[in-house]
């Protein structure tokens, strides 16, 4: 759903976009917030629990001081590039987005290295010690994320999986940090990655293939948390079609 001029003016009780200072669009099923580019006076905006996948529209809100984006679909921390030019930004809530990955520490350090003026991140005060550590432990973001297309809709699955795919390629098991650092959040959402005991013992010959397959499965299960009912239905249909195709191949093999 696109955030429209009418929606903004109604919620902000304003007559013109350029005069809007505070806006609350919590849980509005939004995917497109491009109209934010027309709100230069915006200071506080709440966009939590939506389906927003890019931060580019708020890059022109030079007076923005508080940005709430919990539980959206921001795919990569590279999106933080669009916030680097906001001199007044002091409060950011970005938790429960795909970009947070499986390492809370790495995520927090990267955000603080990119946005050192923050005073509060994900409802936790930022300390001087954290800012110092972020210089060496956080990743440096120097360019805007590459995009396939110009829309502001949902991200491609390959982009959302980028960090987890990297872990799979390097042999790093996302189950390690996910089970230890974010089990509480997963309990709340009613979903956990598969435990090691759920996978059967395999020979050394199959170990590498099994490890990669487990990482892919874990990534998929983690991403399911971010989908709404419509998205889950699409996944269900795709899985059903895939299962039907595989069963057809098995029948053909047996016939031969």
UniProtKB/Swiss-Prot annotation:
It comes from Homo sapiens (Human). Widely expressed. Expressed in the retina. It comes from the Eukaryota. One of its GO terms (biological process) is cytoskeleton organization. SUPFAM superfamilies: L domain-like (SSF52058). The keyword Cytoplasm applies. The gene is CFAP410. GO terms for cellular component: ciliary basal body; cytoplasm; cytosol; Golgi apparatus; mitochondrion; nucleoplasm; photoreceptor connecting cilium; photoreceptor outer segment. Changing residue 111 to M: In SMDAX; increases protein degradation; changes protein localization. Keywords: Cell projection, Ciliopathy, Cilium biogenesis/degradation, Cytoplasm, Cytoskeleton, Disease variant, DNA damage, Dwarfism, Leucine-rich repeat, Mitochondrion, Phosphoprotein, Repeat. The modification Phosphoserine is found at residues 136, 177. This is Cilia- and flagella-associated protein 410. It is linked to Retinal dystrophy with or without macular staphyloma: An ocular disorder characterized by decreased vision which worsen over time, and dystrophic changes in the retina, such as retinal pigment epithelium mottling and vessel narrowing. Macular staphyloma, without high myopia, is present in some patients. Disulfide bonds: none annotated. Signal peptide: none annotated.
């Amino acid at each position: 759903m696109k955030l429209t001029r009418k929606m903004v003016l109604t919620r902000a009780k304003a007559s013109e976009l350029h005069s809007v200072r505070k806006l609350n669009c919590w849980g509005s099923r939004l995917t497109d917030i491009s109209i934010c580019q027309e709100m230069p006076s915006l200071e506080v905006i709440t966009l939590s629990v939506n389906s927003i996948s890019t931060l580019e529209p708020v890059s022109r809100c030079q007076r923005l001081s508080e940005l709430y984006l919990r539980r959206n679909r921001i795919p990569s921390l590279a999106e933080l590039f669009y916030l680097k030019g906001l001199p007044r930004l002091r409060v950011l809530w970005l938790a429960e987005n795909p970009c947070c990955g499986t390492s809370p520490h790495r995520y927090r350090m990267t955000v603080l290295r990119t946005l050192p003026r923050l005073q509060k991140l994900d409802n936790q005060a930022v300390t001087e010690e954290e800012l110092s550590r972020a210089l060496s432990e956080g990743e440096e973001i120097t360019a805007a994320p590459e995009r396939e297309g110009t829309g502001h809709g949902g991200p491609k699955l390959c982009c959302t999986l980028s960090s987890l795919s990297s872990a799979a390629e390097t042999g790093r098991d996302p189950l390690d940090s996910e089970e230890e650092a974010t089990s509480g959040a997963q309990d709340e959402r009613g979903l956990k990655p598969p435990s090691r005991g759920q996978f059967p013992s395999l020979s050394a010959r199959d170990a590498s293939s099994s490890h990669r397959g487990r990482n892919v499965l874990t990534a998929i299960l983690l991403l399911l948390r971010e989908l709404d009912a419509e998205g889950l239905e699409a996944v269900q249909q795709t899985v059903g079609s895939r299962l039907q195709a595989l069963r057809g191949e098995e029948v053909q093999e047996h016939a031969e």
